[in-house]
Design a protein with these regions (language model features):
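Conserved GTP-binding G-domain of TRAFAC-class P-loop NTPases and closely related GTPase folds
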Residues: 2-9, 14-17, 22-27, 100, ...
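Residue-level recognition of the N-termini of beta-strands and the immediately preceding loop/turn
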Residues: 4, 33-35, 78, 105-107
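Conserved substrate/cofactor phosphate-moiety recognition/catalytic segment
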Residues: 18-77, 124
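Flexible, glycine- and charge-enriched loops at secondary-structure boundaries
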Residues: 50, 54-61, 84, 129, ...
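Glycine-rich phosphate-binding loop used to anchor ATP phosphates in small-molecule kinases
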Residues: 55-106
Length: 167
């Protein structure tokens, strides 16, 4: 069986991580293996109490990529890359660093919600998990749904790319 990489796309508070939890449960009922690599969890494991949210971002990104590559190399059936990936540049930055097997399927799972919904959900968060409202509003303005126009001719080495959008 081939690995499927599911790259989450959505602003903070859109419901990406909640969607991932539900999808993991569904996939595991089918007796397939899953691995969720959350950039937030990677960040929490690296940052200290003295650090601010975006401190050590290079180290966080490198570890995020390392964990995704490791899961794909292990042959996990479905690997989730749980982070915002709101722009073509952020998606290309990630995918350009991954070791893609030609048999690996890439799916962009896009969670597109109104900014008001994301702000309401974010207001319920505490500590480092709570993002400034201004940052969420700015990210919503920079948000774009992946399109074939942004894919390189090589498809980053993936055999198949699909985009699914949820509202």
């Amino acid at each position: 069986m081939t690995t499927e990489l599911k790259v989450m796309v959505g602003i903070p508070g859109s419901g990406k991580s909640t969607w991932v939890k539900q999808e993991v449960a569904r996939i595991e009922e089918e007796h397939r293996t899953t691995c969720v690599v959350s950039r937030d969890f990677v960040r929490q494991s690296i940052l200290t109490d003295r650090d601010s949210y975006f401190d050590k971002e290079v180290e966080v990104f490198d570890e995020f990529v390392r964990q995704i590559n490791e899961a794909m190399e292990l042959g996990i059936d479905v690997v989730f890359a749980d982070a915002t990936h709101i722009s073509p540049a952020s998606r290309a930055k990630l995918l350009g660093r991954l070791i893609a097997d030609p048999h690996t399927k890439l799916t962009f799972e896009v969670i597109d919600v109104p900014v008001e919904t994301a702000l309401e959900r974010n207001a319920q968060r505490t500590g480092v998990a709570r993002i400034p409202d201004s940052a969420i509003k700015k990210m919503k303005k920079g948000f774009s749904i992946p399109t074939e126009k942004e894919f390189p001719k090589t498809n980053w080495g993936f055999s198949n790319i699909e985009v699914r959008v949820y509202h």
